[in-house]
Amino acid sequence: MFTSAHANRSPLTSASVRRPSHSVVEHSATGLISEIVYREDQPMMTQLLLLPLLQQLGQQSRWQLWLTPQQKLSKEWVQSSGLPLSKVMQINQMSPCNTLESMIRALRTGNYNVVIGWLTDELTEQEHERLALAAEEGHPMGFIMRPVRNTSQPGRQLSGLKIHSNLYH
């Protein structure tokens, strides 16, 4: 699993984000769009990376939105994963085009601390810019989940992980 070259860009810092309706602590890592490319035959790797973050974000007052193509989150899985059932929303059976537009709208609202969307194709620079601007406006974290394609691309890393975060530096 790896993140894309344009992942983890955040134009905001914790000092520059202040809203009366949410505490600064809730916005310490906001306005972030990351792309997680994963292997479908190894779902545990993705869960090991994302679940601790999602559990921590679940303690905040805002919702978590999952835009899934076909899978439906089970109530049992959400609870056993330590996620707050009362703060997890899911919209499933969306086409990739609708997923991107729905992500942009959801990121802008400020109602969610995280928006997770599954896409099959890489984003264009323009699509990524639209997502980044929406995240800057609404202050959530956005995760684009994309499965690895079997065709190898020359010069591109096919496994590994890069994490860039101003939380740890």
Swiss-Prot record:
Residues 1-16 have a biased composition (Polar residues). InterPro entries: Cell_div_suppressor_SulA (IPR004596), P-loop_NTPase (IPR027417), SulA_CellDiv_inhibitor (IPR050356), SulA_enterobact (IPR047696). It holds the Pfam family SulA. Induction: By DNA damage, as part of the SOS response. The record marks H169 as: Essential for degradation by Lon protease. Residues 106-112 are annotated as: FtsZ binding. GO terms for biological process: division septum assembly; DNA repair; negative regulation of cell division; SOS response. Residues 1-20 are annotated as: Disordered. Is rapidly cleaved and degraded by the Lon protease once DNA damage is repaired. Keywords: Cell cycle, Cell division, DNA damage, Septation, SOS response. Belongs to the SulA family. Component of the SOS system and an inhibitor of cell division. Accumulation of SulA causes rapid cessation of cell division and the appearance of long, non-septate filaments. In the presence of GTP, binds a polymerization-competent form of FtsZ in a 1:1 ratio, thus inhibiting FtsZ polymerization and therefore preventing it from participating in the assembly of the Z ring. This mechanism prevents the premature segregation of damaged DNA to daughter cells during cell division. HAMAP family: SulA. NCBIfam families: PRK10595.1 (NF007892), SOS_SulA_coli (TIGR00623). This is Cell division inhibitor SulA. The lineage of its organism: Bacteria, Pseudomonadati, Pseudomonadota, Gammaproteobacteria, Enterobacterales. The gene is sulA.
